[in-house]
Amino acid sequence: MYLGEKAGKFFPQKSPERERVLEWLFWQVGGLGPMAGQVSHFVNYAPNFPGDHSYSEERYKNEYDRLLGVMDRILNEREYLAGDYSIADMASFPWVTAYKRYEVNLDLFANVRRWFDAIKSRPAVRKGIDVGKAARNFGEGISKESLKTMFKQDAKSIAEMAKKKEKE
């Protein structure tokens, strides 16, 4: 929001367009982002831990699928989430890019597919995708120590790490 307001682009200043962008931006923040993050965890990282994670993976894949359905319905009425290309699309797009890793057939959501392809073809978006390629590993080759740091933390372990750092 800050950059949209500061640059004066991709974030309308007048209602009702502004409210529509905010509605979809917060939809992403409260729905699409968290659910896609959960799918990512159970698809990419949970297999590194013992136990059956199939229920969790299935649950979050279904919710991700449902959210793509919500997008598909609104994109049947307009080109972009809030009408014109906006920060709402910019915030949502990255969470849709992983659809293949989540084993989602994006072609089942024709309007999302059209939206996705339109955004992906934007030159600035292409540059951003290319810049981030080297940083994406989706859990491949992560050390056991890194996994422990990422997922086995609680208040006690964080306090112990802080004490250890103080001694260094």
Model-based region annotation:
Residues Y60-L67, W115:
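Alpha-helical packing segments of well-folded alpha/beta enzyme cores
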Residues K6-F10, W24, E77-R78, T97-E103:
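Alpha-helix C-capping/helix-to-loop hinge sites
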Residues G31, M35-S40, Y80-L108, R113-I119:
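GST superfamily/GST-like fold recognition
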Residues G132-E168:
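Acidic/histidine-enriched, glycine/proline-rich intrinsically disordered or flexible terminal extensions
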Residues K9, R73-D84, P123-G128:
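Surface-exposed helix-capping loop/turn segments at secondary-structure junctions
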Residues M71, D89, I119-V125:
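Residue-level signal for nonpolar/aromatic packing positions in well-ordered secondary structure
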Residues M1-E58, N62, D72, I158-E168:
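GST-like domain detector, emphasizing the conserved glutathione-binding G-site
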